[in-house]
Design a protein with these regions (language model features):
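Catalytic core of non-heme Fe(II) oxygenases with the double-stranded beta-helix
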Residues: 94-155
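Non-heme Fe(II)/2-oxoglutarate
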Residues: 1-107
Length: 155
């Protein structure tokens, strides 16, 4: 018997991890002080305080997001966003919010609309390793998900 085997290897794209400099972090905190509209009604998370975040003078877009989009394009290309139209579209920053997350609040698995997405953590009130060690010793689990950001990646 001869098997007719065809191999399929889907193309995968990577993601970027960026350490923000002090200017970018200070800009986000400054925007957070001027928080405007509640944003909770547009989100799936179980977080009490979520607000729209306005990027003053497009600082975040110009100095962080756009350079990351350009870097991503040089590294991986942008062919995953091919749109069946004859005009080219330029990326822009849209729908930015800030969550003030407290103990016992969480975000379930969810998706972000748009082509690219990002998250920034500015103040984490605990140490990951302490959380993982504590709960592992209690229930002897193999996985350490307490206080983690889980990334479900498909294409």
């Amino acid at each position: 018997m001869t098997l007719d085997i065809n191999e399929h290897q889907p193309k995968n794209y990577g993601w970027l991890e960026v350490d923000l400099d002090d200017d970018a972090v200070n800009h986000i905190w400054s925007c957070a002080k001027d928080k405007k509209q509640p944003y909770k009604d547009r989100l799936v998370g179980h977080i009490e305080s979520s607000y729209e975040l306005l990027d003053k003078n497009d600082y975040l877009w110009k100095n962080v997001i756009k350079p990351c989009v350009n870097y991503y394009g040089r590294r991986y290309g942008h062919d995953h966003i091919t749109i069946p139209i004859e005009t080219s579209l330029k990326p822009y920053l849209h729908n930015v919010w800030i969550n003030y997350q407290n103990q016992c609040e969480y975000n379930p698995i969810h998706d972000h609309g748009g082509v690219y997405s990002f998250a920034a953590w500015l103040k984490i009130p605990y140490d990951y390793y302490m959380q993982a060690d504590h709960y592992t010793s209690i229930d002897n689990t193999k996985a350490h998900f307490n206080g983690t950001f889980c990334f479900e990646y498909t294409n």
